[in-house]
Amino acid sequence: MSESLAEVVLSLDEVHALALRVLTHNGMSAAHAQAIANVITQGQRDECHSHGVYRLLVCVRSLKKGKVDPQAVPTLRRLSSSIVAVDAHRGFSLLSFETGLPVLVEMAKQHGIAAMAINHCYHFSALWPEVEAIAAEGLVGIAMNPSHSWVAPEGGREPVFGTNPIAFAWPRPDGVPFVFDFATSAIARGDIELHAKQGKAIPPHWAIDADGQPTTDPKAALQGAMRTFGGHKGSALAAMVELLGGALIGDMTSRESMAFDEGVGATPCHGELVIAFDPKVFLGDELDAGLARGERMFASITGQGARLPSQRRFDARARSIAHGVRIPKALYDEILTLLD
């Protein structure tokens, strides 16, 4: 570790160790702490600051609110030959994902397509680590979930939707997968929280205030409603996530999750839907040809100077592996108070 007046530089091992210390010190089981520390380290490594070590503050706050069970043991049920459900029992979601992933992969490789529902989980993390884990098995992955009702539908002013992210990963023959992970809101909730914490203005298309007017004040945005991206198109996708990641799998919508919170301010509790496809089953002897089609499309994008989604993350990943990560000292000091 090195330190300046403004920043602290940590290796990835030091980030992981810090996360483990904070989580176990605050009552998290070793299994949950390991699963969460892995993903927080990945977020910080890829310079996804709203999903890196900042999330330790969110995790501990939720634990202290008494909603999350830090010792919950996920249970798994096979609903059919290609559908698995994992009950998180009001624990954080990441251990449930790790519990169900091997079964999801097995089912997808047997049938060509499989789905996993994660129920009754508290969820704070990005989805790209999950779909990247699916792509690492040679599979195509999709994941989505509702959250708390922070987002107004296009043309409305009252929150109905969550930030409702959708993530997708496509395995590539060489190198990193093609990945995207984006909220159907104009921006992730955590980014507005970070702007408020740092006293920075936000773009007016991110949110509206309590009177329904566009705002550049992040604190007013947090008291008002976030906006969807892409107008009515973003609203439609957000509704789809509510249906697939909530109603379809027997779990709460974002409005129900907000009501369940009872004003405590914990991490959202809801469900998550994960789908995996096996290109080998779909394509058979044409597998290489199918993947080659994808590669030609990617080349047609990058060949004209455009970037593929997540390229910034992958560039950051290489930097962090080589040089460590930089964390604002004020944030680092705040995280250390969680060890008091």
From Swiss-Prot:
Q: Record's superkingdom?
A: Bacteria
Q: What EC number is given for this enzyme?
A: 1.5.1.49
Tell me the residue numbers annotated for binding substrate. Answer: 55, 163, 189-190
Catalytic residue list: 50-51, 191
Picking any one GO molecular function of the record gives: oxidoreductase activity
* Chain residues that bind NADP(+): 123-127, 181-183, 232-233, 307-313
Q: Which Pfam families match?
A: Ldh_2
Per its record, the protein catalyses:
L-proline + NAD(+) = 1-pyrroline-2-carboxylate + NADH + H(+); L-proline + NADP(+) = 1-pyrroline-2-carboxylate + NADPH + H(+)
Cysteine-cysteine disulfides:
none
Its function, per the record, reads: Catalyzes the reduction of Delta(1)-pyrroline-2-carboxylate (Pyr2C) to L-proline, using NADPH as the electron donor. May be involved in a degradation pathway that converts trans-3-hydroxy-L-proline (t3LHyp) to L-proline.
Assembly and partners? Homodimer.
Family of this protein: Belongs to the LDH2/MDH2 oxidoreductase family.
Protein name, please? Answer: Delta(1)-pyrroline-2-carboxylate reductase 1
Question: From what organism does this protein derive?
Answer: Burkholderia ambifaria (strain ATCC BAA-244 / DSM 16087 / CCUG 44356 / LMG 19182 / AMMD) (Burkholderia cepacia (strain AMMD))
